[in-house]
Amino acid sequence: MLFRSHGNGASFRLLEQCGADSINPVRDLSLDMLCALRASVSVPLDVHTDCPEGSGGFIRTYEAPEIVRCCAPVYLKIGNSALAAHGSLPTEADAARMAQQAAIVMEMLERYLPEARQLARGEGRGLVAEAEVRV
């Protein structure tokens, strides 16, 4: 497993051609950048909705519906802001805060993008090639 983020369409295409089944964009890309990257590949994207303070400390809860709209199929990575640093093991209290953050993101999705649904494992493959991607 490779833990490295990428931020341009050429590297996304290369990763897909090399067999990547999902791609993790750089954490702090704008929505416009994420939409453009989505247009370059058909594999799901792994997009962080938040990150630990030691890695920038951003929280994109209110952007989650728009991330899903422009990046689907997408795996939202939720709850990292509860951790002290990237890669640290969560405590029981951290896990509770991570679950709370996930519930808040789900609430935002239900409120602002109710038509979104969670796909079954593997169901997202090939969807992008068939869908219209609006940037």
Describe every region a protein language model picked out.
Residues 15:
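Conserved, mostly hydrophobic/aromatic
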Residues 47, 58, 69-98:
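A conserved mid-domain beta-alpha-beta active-site/ligand-binding segment of alpha/beta enzyme cores
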